[in-house]
Amino acid sequence: MPAAEASPLYQLIEAVPDVETYCRLRAESGLSPKTEEAARRGLAGTLFAVQVCCGGETVGMGRVIGDGGCFYQVVDIAVLPAHQGLGLGKRIMAAISGYIEREAPTSAYISLIADGDAKHLYAQFGFKPTAPRSEGMALFKRAAQQP
């Protein structure tokens, strides 16, 4: 398959995915699953989102969340396994970087959490580890009990 940058098969659209698409992409791309309720609430707070479509199907996505002034966080960078390795993650990040360049004030703090080797992709867009000056931390709520 040709590189996604040169392929007319892939279209990049600036749009927030619907709840079903969002949950499917997260689960199928290996990100932690989210409930529909969590997705509905979270997607409403999106500052910027991009989707990659192929043949009418959304095969990749990325979002920016935050307060729109001081803090921006890059989240949900996901590409379905069958479409990985084609430069789609790079296209998603290029669109997100363009948004941040246009919209974020110079004093804004832009962050993300890099899973595994994704750190190499993010480094191409200027992201650097914050350690040892700072260290990312998280609080995990227990997943809702399934019936």
PLM region spans:
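Short amphipathic alpha-helix that is part of the acyltransferase structural core
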Residues: 2-37
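Conserved catalytic-core motifs of GNAT/GCN5-like acyltransferases
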Residues: 107, 111-113, 123, 128-146
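Conserved acetyl-CoA pyrophosphate-binding loop and the N-cap/start of the following alpha-helix
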Residues: 83, 87-95
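Conserved GNAT acetyl-CoA-binding A-motif
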Residues: 93, 100-114
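Conserved acetyl-CoA binding element of GNAT-fold acetyltransferases
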Residues: 70-81, 137
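A short helix-loop-beta-strand connector motif used in the catalytic cores of GNAT acetyltransferases and
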Residues: 41-51, 106-108
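Conserved beta-hairpin
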Residues: 47-62
